[in-house]
Amino acid sequence: EEAMAAKRQPLSRAAREESKKKFYAVNVYEKKPNDEDYSMYAYGLFTNLSKIALKMNVENRYKVECLIVTEEDDQVYAKDGAYLAPFLHGANKGTKATNAFVFSKDENLNGLTKGETAIANGKSVQYPRLVKLYGTINDFSPKATKDLTIDMRRAVFGLHFKVTPPNEGKLIITYAGWHITLTKSSAAYDNRATYSFSDILKACQDGYQTTMDVKAVWTKDDGTVEEESKQLLLKRNVMTVVNIKVEGQKPKSFIFKEEESNMTTENVEWDLIL
């Protein structure tokens, strides 16, 4: 295990940092003095933190939930300028990052706590390689409190794979919808990434951990296929280092232990009287 922290990146990767976005997805619910339950009030998808502001009735109470998504190795997919999961609103409709609230009593961003995330080419994954933080505040009173502060909690884990290429054939490592493929001529694989958990509500709690299966399939030159699986323990805010090396049965040497050449002597007496 390693503590999760920033690391230096090659220039080629650093150049891509500029295109990465940070999203703030916000749902606001309102409860009037005579209401028993909260009702939908407003929602919005923002990329500019300074634009997140909303007028509230001082006589009412409010509940706010927010999901912050920072792109890393993966980017959130947008179709025709509208972002898909986890930023869908209403009946699975994409949402544009307008940096403004939409007032609605009928729909809002309904996938903030789901793991499903649409990335490149619309591919849906449960463990995207990006950072998610989730937080809520209940019974906020504009009259009693001036500032609305939400405690945002990380719902992420890290995996650092170090894989030695096979000495023959092809090796495929699969995990959480991702895969690593190496052959004898491949360079050693050494890569780390940050992933978001699929259960956002539980994953932002201290001490959260879950398991994930990692499968290794080795196809040898003669067509023989060897398969093994291992369960990894994933911990919140922990980078887990996974070292993988496959080896076939090594040739067995033949050892011949020869009997010593020393011979004992036995006498045979044969007296003939003819």
Predicted regions and their residues:
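Structural motif
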Residues: 1-19, 162-170
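Tryptophan-paired
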Residues: 16-80, 85-87, 169-238, 268-274
